């Protein structure tokens, strides 16, 4: 039997760390198909912190792709599980036959599915990538992303799967220590990545609430982002008074980030695709409602779990936000499909499907 190989095809430290830690701590002990990884980027201590995994690192996305293609050609029974897929060479290999459809299983992370960049090289590449995506052996994704993908590729198998957000289930029913009243605190975006469209989001928040709310913008990740942080701060200060705007430019440890989220009353996410599920989960767990773009299909996942959804096109005010908080507080968090530990069983199923051991 050939063991499934997992591929992290792009050097995205935060996401890669989350996946590797999840596999090491949760999946590797029970499945031999959860131990082999090929990773773009440097070790950065992963080998030491993930002793249950066999990790091979490659200095570039191209070097990793070449190694994957060589393995695929050497053994056509070798299957790969691609987590996110931000690697042009791998898509082209699927198009050219270097990797066969039966060897290619893909966990959609959102950004790798949607065609949102206006850069020329992306606009030229998107049609090729779209064709390649129709040739994969199967996909795993959120309900909304499965629906989006199926409209383009109805014949490709799709299975429900959620990114393994780091969560403590014991916090689901945690008593609220903070009385939710007074000035609203609004979280804008889930990171400092430009895909959060921070400036447009700040303008939208101002249009809805004016300079009457506290606005918190976490921008400590990714690194080397100071010019964009300054740009967002300047735009924010043109709208909000200094005491109402908090731009966080330092990377935060998980517990500190969790504490920050729990001080908020609302999450505001303007991007028109699925992303930031981890932050959404942590907000929902704390009974903090989220405002989504109606083009972000994750609203389908939330509605399926009977969670209140607010949209950027809604008329928002404190009364609407407090009512959404009340509705969230009445939900039994232990039954939410995309919460830990409920997302575990779909991962076990996904491993068996990608490895060819399940129909």
Swiss-Prot record:
Pathway(s) of this molecule: Bacterial outer membrane biogenesis; enterobacterial common antigen biosynthesis
Annotated Gene Ontology cellular component terms: plasma membrane
Main location: membrane
Membrane-topology annotation of the record: Peripheral membrane protein
Localization: Cell inner membrane
Alphabetized InterPro entries for the sequence: WecF
GO process terms (BP): enterobacterial common antigen biosynthetic process; fucosylation
Gene Ontology MF terms in the entry: 4-acetamido-4,6-dideoxy-D-galactose transferase activity; fucosyltransferase activity
HAMAP family, per database record: WecF_RffT (MF_01002)
Annotated protein name in UniProt: TDP-N-acetylfucosamine:lipid II N-acetylfucosaminyltransferase
Organism placement in taxonomy: Bacteria, Pseudomonadati, Pseudomonadota, Gammaproteobacteria, Enterobacterales
């Amino acid at each position: 039997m050939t063991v499934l190989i997992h591929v992290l095809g792009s050097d995205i430290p935060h996401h890669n760390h989350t996946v590797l830690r999840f596999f090491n701590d949760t999946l590797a002990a029970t499945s031999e198909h959860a131990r082999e990884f090929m990773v773009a980027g440097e070790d950065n201590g992963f080998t030491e912190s993930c002793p249950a995994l066999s990790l091979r690192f490659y200095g570039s996305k191209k070097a990793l792709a070449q190694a994957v293609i060589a393995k695929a050609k050497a053994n056509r029974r070798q299957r790969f599980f691609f987590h996110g897929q931000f690697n042009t060479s791998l898509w082209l290999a699927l198009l050219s036959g270097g990797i066969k459809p039966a060897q290619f299983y893909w966990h959609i992370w959102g950004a790798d599915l949607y065609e949102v960049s206006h850069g020329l090289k992306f606009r030229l590449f998107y049609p090729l990538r779209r064709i390649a995506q129709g040739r994969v052996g199967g996909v795993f994704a959120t309900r909304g992303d499965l629906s989006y993908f199926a409209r383009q590729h109805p014949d490709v198998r799709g299975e429900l799967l959620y990114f393994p957000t780091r969560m403590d289930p014991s916090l689901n029913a945690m008593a609220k220590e903070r009385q939710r009243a007074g000035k609203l605190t609004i979280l804008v975006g889930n990171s400092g990545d430009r895909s959060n469209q921070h400036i447009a989001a700040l303008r939208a928040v101002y249009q809805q609430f004016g300079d009457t709310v506290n606005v918190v913008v976490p921008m400590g990740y990714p690194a080397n982002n100071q010019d964009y942080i300054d740009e967002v701060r300047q735009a924010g200060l043109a709208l909000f008074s200094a005491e109402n705007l908090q731009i966080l430019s330092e990377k935060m440890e998980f517990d500190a980030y969790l504490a920050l989220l729990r001080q908020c009353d609302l999450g505001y996410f303007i991007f028109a695709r699925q992303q930031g599920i981890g932050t959404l989960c942590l907000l929902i767990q704390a009974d903090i409602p989220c405002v989504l773009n109606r083009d972000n299909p994750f609203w389908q996942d939330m509605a399926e779990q009977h969670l209140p959804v607010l949209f950027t096109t809604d008329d928002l005010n404190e009364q609407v936000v407090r009512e959404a908080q009340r509705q969230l507080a009445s939900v039994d968090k232990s039954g939410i499909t995309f919460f830990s530990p409920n997302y575990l069983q779909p991962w076990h199923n996904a491993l068996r499907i990608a490895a060819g051991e399940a129909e």
